[in-house]
């Protein structure tokens, strides 16, 4: 009888695991934001910083991401932007917010003659405010919309 129950429950277990498993390895939007944009410990001062970081953060897999910005501030400072004055995002959505102060950032721009797999980036450092799109509960950055 115990074996019969186990055999009856097995298909149900397979169904549940099939539904749950794909989401286990999926990167959340907030985690992707951190991977692509946060480097609290870095300074971005090396001319090869962007080449190294874009590769390390998996933004040169299959193609070269044309533009990316790294923020060199504590994550809490970036999260704080989500409680600032609301601004319209570039895509017209209303979930963007501008940081209250300028932050240390590094812009990485793909050089014109650069082609995959040899992605070559120009590294530029700035002190600028950032505009981030925020979502979720807790309300956290999920997209870096601009630096101004």
Curated annotation (Swiss-Prot):
GO biological process annotation, one example: defense response to Gram-positive bacterium
Name the record gives this protein: Ribonuclease pancreatic
Organism: Gerbilliscus gambianus
Cell location: Secreted
Entry similarity comment: Belongs to the pancreatic ribonuclease family.
Leader peptide range in chain numbering: 1-25
Subunit structure: Monomer. Interacts with and forms tight 1:1 complexes with RNH1. Dimerization of two such complexes may occur. Interaction with RNH1 inhibits this protein.
One GO location term (cellular component): extracellular region
Keywords: Disulfide bond, Endonuclease, Hydrolase, Lyase, Nuclease, Secreted, Signal
Enzyme class, spelled out: lyase
